[in-house]
Curated annotation (Swiss-Prot):
This is Ribosomal protein uS12 methylthiotransferase RimO. [4Fe-4S] cluster 2 binds at residues 147, 151, 154. It comes from Xanthomonas axonopodis pv. citri (strain 306). Residues 373-441 form the TRAM domain. Catalyzes the methylthiolation of an aspartic acid residue of ribosomal protein uS12. GO terms for molecular function: 4 iron, 4 sulfur cluster binding; aspartic acid methylthiotransferase activity; metal ion binding; protein methylthiotransferase activity. Its cofactor is [4Fe-4S] cluster.
Length: 457
């Protein structure tokens, strides 16, 4: 491109939903002829997409803004922390503009004001699947914004608003474009995937000569037509989640559910304003495993929530023993500015929270190690993410990127595997988190995807 093109640096922080927001902004910048550069020095202006969910994320976002201000001086701030402009401007009064999440138009207007485009837009500069910040072989597919729940520890609705679902045909067309661009795995994300379409009264829309409801199961049926891995994230434990387990058993969806249970004590769940029928939750987990023996269930939990007693924490450990979840993430409760849980009595001392977190993770590590050990001798279909020397680092159908385990393919170099290859791997060993094995010579017939060479500062 011409050296005259205006140059934008970009910092993307936060969750996969925020990453999708960044991809949309970057796509529009490229459509309008802006160059995206990987350093502050080379940038004419810097956009920082922030996170503001928990205190540590706020600190990280403010630090990133400060770094960009010190190194460049021309900074536009957007994202969740942008819902608190006074906090940003108190720390950095010289930022050019502040906007909230999903406010793409305000970001572009701020960029135009600071750095007008120097030529007419060239749509052909951008592939039809847009600019991606993930490797080319997988992509996050955001199906809605906002959330209708009011969990006491969460401030997402105040930042991103109530649930707004994207029409199902719009989502399916985006998925088609991504697959045409080389994507082998679609990761469905939202604040509440199982509530998808409720705000649109499950309206029907046409796609590929068929009507689809704007509903989780119908969306999954449509995505299954694309012939790539489809993985569900952020699934709220509603009863109708059972409807998609059959699709997993039929091989139409990856047998994987990311479903945050948060706790096992009915009283604590009530304080969290979460569903509290723990016995039903256990029954459903067992039913899912009976319907689809291959299913991987990932969940997240909060330990040390205000009022959590020793007995209630022990009940959480008992739940882990009974549920035998495959993948688990946990956090020690941390107050979030604006969350109603901050006002709850009987706050748990920090040292107790950390001790409980350590015990919780040690318990789950034992469970995970045994579940992974049971896969030794099996053959797992894997997607190659990285080539390191002679070893291919991949993920099985049970592993989402960045949050789950890896499969280390010892003979990856010998077979000439490439990033984006789908390959069958015979598992020979395991540890608490990862699997190790050898690719079967006939297992990597799928053509590899090409890694997107895009950097962000």
């Amino acid at each position: 491109m011409s050296q005259l093109n205006p140059k934008v640096g970009f910092v993307s922080l936060g969750c996969p939903k925020a990453l999708v927001d960044s991809e949309r902004i970057l796509t529009q910048l490229r459509v309008e002829g802006y160059d995206i550069v990987p350093s502050y020095d080379a940038a004419d202006v810097v956009v920082v997409n922030t996170c503001g969910f928990i205190d540590s994320a706020v600190t990280e976002s403010l630090d990133a803004i400060g770094e960009a201000m010190n190194a460049n001086g021309k900074v536009i701030v957007t994202g969740c922390l942008g819902k608190r402009p006074e906090q940003i401007r108190e720390a950095y009064p010289q930022v050019l503009a502040v906007s909230g999440p999903q406010d793409y138009q305000s970001v572009m207007e701020a960029v135009h004001a600071a750095l007008p485009p120097r030529h007419d837009p060239f749509v052909d500069l951008v592939p039809d699947y847009g600019i991606k910040l993930t490797p080319r072989h997988y992509a996050y597919l955001k199906i809605s914004e906002g959330c209708n729940h009011r969990c006491s520890f969460c401030i997402i609705p105040s930042m991103r608003g109530d649930l707004v679902s994207r029409p199902v045909d719009e989502v399916l067309r985006e998925a088609e474009r991504l697959v045409r661009g080389g994507v082998k795995e679609l990761l469905v994300v939202s604040q509440d995937t199982s509530a998808y379409g409720v705000d649109l009264k499950y309206a029907e829309r046409p796609w590929r000569d068929r009507l689809y409801q704007t509903r989780m199961k119908a969306l999954c049926e449509g995505l299954s037509e694309l012939g790539v891995w489809t993985r569900l994230h952020y699934v709220y434990p509603y009863p109708h989640v059972d409807d998609v387990i059959g699709l997993m058993a039929e091989g139409k969806l990856l047998p994987y559910l990311d479903i945050p249970f948060q706790h096992a004590s009915p009283r604590i769940l009530k304080l969290m304003k979460r569903p509290g029928a723990v016995e039903k939750t256990l029954e459903r987990v067992q039913r899912w495993k009976a319907m689809c023996p291959e299913i991987t269930v990932r969940s997240t939990f909060i330990v040390g929530f205000p009022g959590e007693t020793d007995a209630e924490f022990e009940s959480l450990l008992d739940f882990l023993d009974q549920a035998q979840l495959d993948r688990v993430g946990a956090f020690a409760y941390s107050p979030v500015d604006g969350a109603s849980a901050n006002a709850l009595p009987d706050q748990v001392p920090e040292e107790v929270k950390q001790e409980r977190l350590a015990r919780f993770m040690a318990k789950q590590a034992q469970i995970s190690a045994l579940r992974l050990e049971s896969k030794i001798g099996s053959v797992q279909q894997c997607l190659v993410d990285v080539i390191e020397d002679d070893i291919a680092v991949a993920r099985s159908r049970a592993d989402a990127p960045e949050i789950d385990g890896l499969v280390h393919i010892q003979n990856g170099g010998e077979l000439g595997l490439k990033v984006g290859d789908l390959v069958d791997v015979e598992i020979t060993d395991s540890d608490e988190h990862d699997l190790f094995g050898d690719a079967l010579p006939s297992g990597h017939a799928v053509q590899p995807g090409r890694t997107l060479n895009l950097q962000i500062v």
